């Protein structure tokens, strides 16, 4: 079975637009000032407005971006406008449409929160600034690609310095330790738990990101050969590679919450089901999620996090600058600030956001390292050592293919 990835769909979209629109002459070229040192970029950025397109579905993330905007205005004279997205793919499509229409400068998006499938689509369609700009940021020196390879490899796609790392994420499971003292720690054990406890487990409905990530987690644990998952889906026998996943789901679905006839819309909805005692296990893609929910009174303080014995999916999310950004200098300054120890420390604080840092502690000054070491971890947050066993994300093309097949098989209530 063959699937069209987002990259292929965008190619088709571009062809359609190019056929329909006579390419105009490029807009008046933006005078880009990067210079031999970053001070030149900072000076050129003053007075610019950065239209930062980023998911807007979480108040604590929105508040963090607002804080960053205040700091950037005070320090650099940069205005940061948060354009709140429901789907990053829509922003990618807009950039592609601008390219097809000949808008090679003065684009509507200056900075984009991105990773995985969307980054791969932008890279394939030449929608990114491509001068390895991220590696030239002053704050890049605080990272270590040997310790965290995912900053150079986004869902198996080399980043080539075309996006700047912003934060880390890892799939975690949560359980109420009073109701479920010993949670299942593998796909096989989870299948047995579901069989023995009908109605006590579910997962967010794909295409929710956490729901799709759960499907990938089960596939990685059950597949007889995971190597094809790290190559484009079109190069593989999709039916054969994914058969263990569909077998697992077929066995489990009738014993899910509501008999597998309905699913929580997203992971916050699943978290609420856990808090209300309707299910015994939650899922999130932020190790600090449960602790933050306990602090907000959304979960009881008996909830704890865990991962599977063989590890769980982990990835890095990034900031990218489109090829036609209207304020490329200011976008680089914003990306550098977001990567700085100060901004990363605030972002990692579970009372603020709780998004794990991409910085390498051994690369930091002692006072900055001490700040990270002093962060409250939260009673439900696993330590770095407990999170050390991870699974690499499959090639991004698998995400849509798996989601489409899930919808065909189970999207109408199993």
Short names for language-model regions:
Residues 37-46, 53, 57-79, 173:
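Short, polar/charged alpha-helical segment
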Residues 2-17:
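Bacterial N-terminal signal peptides that target proteins for export
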Residues 34-36, 272, 379-414:
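Conserved C-terminal helix/tail region of periplasmic/extracytoplasmic solute-binding proteins
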Residues 55-67, 82-92, 105, 109-268:
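Extracytoplasmic ligand-binding site segments that recognize negatively charged/polar headgroups
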